[in-house]
Amino acid sequence: MKIRSAKVIVTCPGRNLVTLKIETDEGVYGIGDATLNGREKSVVSYLEDHVIPTLIGKDPQRVEDIWQYLYRGAYWRRGPVGMTAIAAVDVALWDIKAKLAGMPLYQLLGGKSREKVMVYGHATGLDIESCLEEVRKHVELGYKAVRVQCGIPGIPTTYGVSKEAGKPYEPADSALPAEHVWSTEKYLNNVPELFAAVRKEFGEDLHILHDVHHRLTPIQAARLGKEVEKFHLFWLEDCTAVENQSSYELIRKHTTTPLAIGEVFNSLSDCQELIQNQLIDYIRATITHAGGITNIRRIADFASVFHVKTGFHGATDLSPVCMGAALHFDTWVPNFGIQEHMPHTKETDLVFPHAYEFNDGFFTPGDVPGHGVDIDEEIAAKYPYKPAYLPVNRLEDGTLWNW
């Protein structure tokens, strides 16, 4: 069996999504997610110009060998564009391999470690009261865990908060990057009130998560983690940038609030120190940006040695193809923690028919051979690419800051 063809499909049924489709000479095909939010065309070019020509004629069942070929052979290793492209190939090949075996992907990985996968949803609001209403909607749907974000008085835009009530949060929404304003002081003074309100309204049984989105310095993050210990958060996510992984030592020394990070990581090297020194509790890497199933399995296996659990990124900047693959991985991986979930648009679900199902706060991946997600190319063609870039942040004095 050999790879006969491969092509990239770009569609925008709500936001830009990139899919790689690989077909064998026996007619079996697999698909992988190649979406890199705000940089989609960079991955398209990398795949079409540098990856696809090298795949033709290769044995699709040699998944590890092809992964090594694309990683080691490129010389310019790692980086979000290259690793997203490799991930797309890798997931498509695992999809093919599972289809050839006639089994769902989780079975090929080693079988079930659990019957269902706990997910957390996103509740946002322009203020605390409106955020509580969104939390209530999630609880009524059966969610056991909810990420909470709300507007901060005095800041016109806040990460994770929709511009309009009831609308999904989509940060990449303009032809050029929008400029947002940020105040660490206002944020730190306000956000504990949100957690207090959620606990008062919903009690201790609901898991509360929160994303700081790299906005704090280590000492500021330590202060926040210490102040919110009494609210028993499931985790505090991305509280500071970690180009210097050892910065988490300071945070860890000052708080017992569980820490999660990693959605921007694309290799074990990005998080090795964080994991082996037990500076985090959850690794947030994603299959699509961390080199696919082959590579994220290495990260998860390493993390398990140090009692670090998975908590994979799963927002709508990734397609249902990634969600399907992630749910199969989550069903297998022994050190599973939780899976992020944001519902895609109805149009997206039509483009990507899938076998996974939600019920009472949990997902099951389905039992069809492969990862259980397909793409309807005719419907995809109805939604052409639209330029959209992620915002940038400035402090109130005009200094550029982490978005």
Curated annotation (Swiss-Prot):
The keyword Lyase applies. The lineage of its organism: Bacteria, Pseudomonadati, Pseudomonadota, Gammaproteobacteria, Oceanospirillales. It comes from the Bacteria. Belongs to the mandelate racemase/muconate lactonizing enzyme family. GalD subfamily. It catalyses: D-mannonate = 2-dehydro-3-deoxy-D-gluconate + H2O. Keywords: Lyase, Magnesium, Metal-binding. One of its GO terms (biological process) is amino acid catabolic process. One of its GO terms (molecular function) is mannonate dehydratase activity. The keyword Lyase applies. SMART domains: MR_MLE (SM00922). Has low D-mannonate dehydratase activity (in vitro), suggesting that this is not a physiological substrate and that it has no significant role in D-mannonate degradation in vivo. Has no detectable activity with a panel of 70 other acid sugars (in vitro). It is an enzyme of class 4 (lyase). Its EC number is 4.2.1.-, 4.2.1.8. This is D-galactonate dehydratase family member Mmwyl1_0037. Mg(2+) binds at D211, E237, E263. Its cofactor is Mg(2+). It holds the Pfam family MR_MLE_N. Signal peptide: none annotated. Substrate binds at N37, H122, E263, R284, H313, D317, E340. The active site is at Y159, H213. Binds 1 Mg(2+) ion per subunit.
